[in-house]
């Protein structure tokens, strides 16, 4: 189960849906929330952070796809430039069982017919 990663992507305000669309099938179960920093505007300008409001994307991806995801973020969405975004991954070493792992990693198996020997609905 160590091949699954939880991604947190901080994108420019109103770019969450665009980011999700660009990443396409490389990510699973994306969710966008609005985020707002707490630093005063003068500190933001000094640090080169830009606007305090951002889109925060939470999603899952397979470890083998993380490099492709970063490539899209940096080269196609411009995250390499100041003010445009940041991303990080956290390995998911344990989840609530094999079925949960399969679902989060993109297995679209119908739960009612899921019969791999360890879970039946």
Q: What is each of the regions a protein language model found here?
A:
Residues 1-121:
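Positively charged, small/polar-rich N-terminal and surface patches that mediate targeting and assembly
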């Amino acid at each position: 189960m160590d091949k699954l990663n939880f991604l947190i992507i901080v994108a420019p305000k109103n770019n969450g849906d665009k980011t999700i669309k660009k990443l396409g099938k490389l990510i699973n179960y994306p969710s966008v929330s609005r985020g707002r920093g707490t630093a005063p505007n003068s500190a933001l300008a000094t640090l080169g952070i830009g606007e305090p409001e951002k889109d925060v994307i939470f999603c899952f991806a397979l470890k083998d796809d993380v490099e492709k995801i970063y490539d899209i973020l940096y080269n196609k969405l411009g995250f390499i430039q100041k003010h445009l975004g940041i991303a990080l991954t956290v390995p998911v070493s344990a989840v609530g069982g094999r079925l949960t792992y399969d679902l989060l990693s993109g297995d679209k198996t119908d739960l009612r017919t899921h019969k791999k020997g360890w879970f039946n609905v």
